């Protein structure tokens, strides 16, 4: 080949490669040009922090394997049960207080009767329910079925699919109790939605899911109080959130003898990666660290369980349902009961409890509770339901009862106040040691040996006052970007101040704090801990905040604690730099990121001064209802806004749910955390709960500490001058 030919061939190859690259990047051929336009159900997001959290959680849950023998399960089962009860917040069951059952209406429908009932699952906490029962009485007692409702926000138990299955079951000879879930149907009132109520309960060590399960357990109590119900024949079935309720209730209450789970069968490992974001009830603290889904279902064994999932279900993908059901069936087989666990992927069906699902359920219930048939589908026949807005199914038509009843948030605040008071009265040494250990666990490194920081200077400007752009690795896969400002040339660096802000380092850069602090001789390092600023990312019209919070919590790594760890690594970064003094190191946390600053200071004695700006003075103040005057706004907030932002906006202030730590109030409130820093200087400025409309008692508890430690509490907004004056003390 001549030299000219070689040159021509190389040119053609280069041109082909260029055209291929251009074709690959050409937006004309892109189906979804922007990944942010995709829905978040089945797509891993473009968030470094969330990708890291998902990867870690999925890796951790892989350790849970199906038992190889009945003996293996005998050993493993108590561990799973303890872990599940702990995650649900049902380690100790609430007292079984009087149900106070009220029958408010009865509707004779010919061959069946519908009673409208209200019972109290807790004192003053009403549950609205419909009881479907056969009109013709037979000799002996009848089997009963609990029918918990999923996320049917407006219609609840009046949904036509709920009515249809209840009517058919009553005609088959069952007594059926359908009841509104907390925050749904007639119980959808301010302070009861799963996001508001769920996050209000977490600091107490309780969950909205545990409360839903307790509603179901009290529903069983009611059924067993009826002379026409056979206590040995109790079934439960529900879809989506109702399937969740059926699964967990059956797992912890062996009075249930038959289970049908619809639209809630999934493998945790699969769902973590591809399941997207869901309601708060799906996220149980630390569950991924305790078990896989099939092990929860294994707690039901050897009772019969039917798992139904639509082939077109986009919320709980059928691939994960098949994996989970295969593992569940394998566990049942190991125990010698392989025929009592069945899975069916319903063709052409999405996420619902439509007729094809119901007919499968009828056959399963008939076989195991009526001792009829082989468990195959039973035709539903003709079923006439009421319109979903028909008032005949309402228990509280004028809403007087529900509006007068305390909400989950109100009840959580009452319990929170009691817990906080008890903490302040607890023996100091014992409670302080327990709190310190709890915080050390929250902020603990993921591995015994720290990962290499790999600090990198991305960009350094020669212009006066411009920040240096840096980043380092907090742990493998978790990069922390930062902006570093140094004092003017010729001015010695007096101290280093690390700043975190709930709005990210960009908010610090645009604040009026940096320049005065820099000119006063301070180096200022503003970082984005995981899930802040550029590490957060978006998916569609949502930030990834809520999804990141939820995955981190289920993995047993609450985000505030992980951000506290990131701050201790920022201290490591400062220690690596010869130009940044470590003496008198100060950490400033703004908004809800004041909590990671406090946690980091408890964990790391190298932090000598701590500033908490615009945080709450008590974790009870995190328990707030969304400020939404109308039911329509409440519906929209439940289903959209909270999941888009991961925040609750109350009448006086907003809470970022990332600052909510499960079981926190079992160990300490904000004043107790501050008291652990008695050997350091602390400035607590402008607490967001200090100027509420109705006043707040919590800042006063914090102020009482000023007599025993170097603590400054001010209700005024933090200014650069105030901060400089405090730093000079």
State each model region's role.
Residues 136-140, 194-239, 256, 541-591:
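Gly/Ser-rich "nucleophile elbow"/oxyanion-hole loop immediately N-terminal to the catalytic nucleophile
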Residues 183-195, 270, 531-546:
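Glycine-rich "HGGG/HGxG" loop immediately N-terminal to the catalytic nucleophile
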Residues 129-131, 139-150, 493-502:
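Short beta-strand element of the alpha/beta-hydrolase
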Residues 8-18:
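Bacterial N-terminal signal peptides
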Residues 24-127, 137, 301-303, 308-481, ...:
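Alpha/beta-hydrolase-fold serine-hydrolase catalytic core, especially in secreted/extracellular enzymes
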Residues 1-9:
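Bacterial N-terminal signal peptides that target proteins for export
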Residues 159-177, 509-526:
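Short amphipathic alpha-helix adjacent to the substrate-entry channel of hydrolases
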Residues 152, 219-289, 570-676:
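Primarily recognizes the serine-hydrolase "nucleophile elbow" in alpha/beta-hydrolase
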């Amino acid at each position: 080949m001549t030299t000219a030919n070689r040159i021509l061939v190389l040119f053609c190859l280069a041109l082909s490669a260029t055209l291929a690259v251009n074709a690959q990047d050409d937006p004309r051929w892109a189906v979804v040009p922007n990944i942010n336009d995709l829905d978040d159900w089945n797509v891993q997001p473009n968030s470094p922090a969330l990708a890291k959290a998902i990867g870690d959680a999925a890796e951790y849950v892989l350790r849970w394997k199906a038992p190889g023998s009945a003996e293996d399960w005998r050993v493993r089962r108590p561990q799973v049960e303890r872990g599940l009860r702990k995650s649900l917040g049902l380690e100790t069951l609430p007292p079984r207080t009087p149900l106070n059952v009220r029958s408010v209406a009865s509707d004779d429908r010919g061959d069946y009767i519908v009673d409208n009932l209200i019972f109290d699952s807790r004192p003053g906490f009403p549950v609205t329910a419909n009881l479907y029962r056969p009109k013709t009485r037979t000799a002996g007692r009848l089997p009963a079925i609990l029918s918990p409702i999923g996320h049917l926000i407006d219609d609840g138990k009046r949904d036509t699919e709920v009515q249809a299955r209840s009517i058919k079951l009553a005609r088959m000879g069952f007594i059926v109790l359908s009841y509104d879930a907390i925050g749904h149907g007639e119980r959808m009132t301010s302070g009861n939605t799963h996001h508001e109520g769920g996050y209000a309960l977490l600091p107490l060590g309780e969950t909205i899911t545990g409360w839903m399960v307790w509603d179901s357990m009290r529903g069983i109590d009611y059924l067993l109080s009826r002379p026409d119900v056979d206590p040995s024949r109790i079934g439960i079935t529900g879809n989506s959130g109702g399937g969740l309720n059926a699964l967990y209730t059956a797992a912890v209450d062996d009075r249930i003898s038959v289970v049908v789970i619809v639209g809630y069968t999934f493998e945790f490992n699969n769902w973590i990666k591809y399941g997207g974001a869901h309601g708060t009830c799906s996220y149980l603290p630390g569950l991924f660290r305790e078990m896989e889904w099939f092990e929860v279902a294994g707690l039901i064994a050897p009772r019969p369980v039917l798992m139904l999932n639509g082939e077109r279900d986009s919320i709980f993908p059928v691939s994960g349902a098949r994996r989970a059901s295969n593992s569940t069936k394998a566990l049942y087989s190991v125990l010698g009961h392989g025929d009592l666990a069945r899975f069916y992927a319903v063709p052409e069906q999405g996420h619902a409890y439509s007729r094809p699902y119901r007919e499968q359920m009828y056959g399963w219930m008939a076989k195991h509770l009526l001792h009829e048939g082989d468990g195959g589908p039973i035709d539903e026949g003709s079923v006439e339901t009421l319109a979903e807005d028909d008032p005949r199914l309402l228990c509280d038509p004028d809403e007087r009862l529900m509006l007068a009843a305390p909400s989950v948030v109100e009840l959580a605040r009452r319990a929170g106040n009691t817990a906080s008071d008890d903490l302040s009265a607890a023996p100091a040494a014992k409670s302080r040691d327990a709190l310190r250990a709890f915080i050390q666990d929250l902020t603990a490194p993921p591995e015994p040996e720290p990962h290499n920081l790999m600090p990198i200077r991305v960009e350094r400007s020669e212009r006066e006052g411009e920040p240096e752009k840096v980043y380092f690795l907090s742990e493998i896969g978790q990069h922390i970007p930062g902006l570093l400002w140094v004092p003017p040339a010729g001015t010695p660096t007096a101290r280093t101040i690390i700043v975190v802000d709930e709005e990210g380092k960009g908010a610090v850069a645009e604040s009026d704090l940096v320049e005065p602090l820099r000119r006063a001789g301070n180096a200022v390092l503003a970082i984005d801990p995981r899930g802040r600023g550029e590490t957060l990312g978006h998916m569609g019209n949502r930030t990834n905040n809520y999804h990141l919070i939820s995955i981190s919590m289920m993995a047993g790594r609450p985000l505030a604690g992980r951000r506290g760890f990131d701050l201790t690594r920022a201290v490591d970064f400062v220690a690596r730099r010869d130009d940044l003094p470590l003496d008198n190191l100060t950490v400033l946390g703004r908004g809800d990121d004041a909590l990671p600053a406090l946690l980091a200071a408890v964990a790391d004695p190298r932090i000598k001064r701590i500033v908490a700006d615009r945080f709450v003075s008590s974790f009870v103040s995190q328990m707030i209802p969304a400020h939404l005057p109308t039911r329509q706004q409440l519906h929209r907030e439940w289903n959209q806004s909270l999941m888009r932002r991961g925040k609750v906006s109350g009448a006086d202030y907003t809470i970022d749910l990332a600052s909510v730590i499960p079981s926190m109030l079992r160990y300490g409130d904000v004043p107790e955390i501050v008291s652990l820093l008695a050997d350091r200087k602390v400035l607590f400025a402008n607490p967001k709960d200090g100027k509420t409309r109705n006043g707040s008692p919590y800042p006063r508890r914090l102020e009482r500490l000023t007599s025993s430690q170097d603590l400054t509490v001010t209700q005024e907004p933090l200014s650069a001058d105030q901060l400089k004056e405090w730093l000079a003390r």
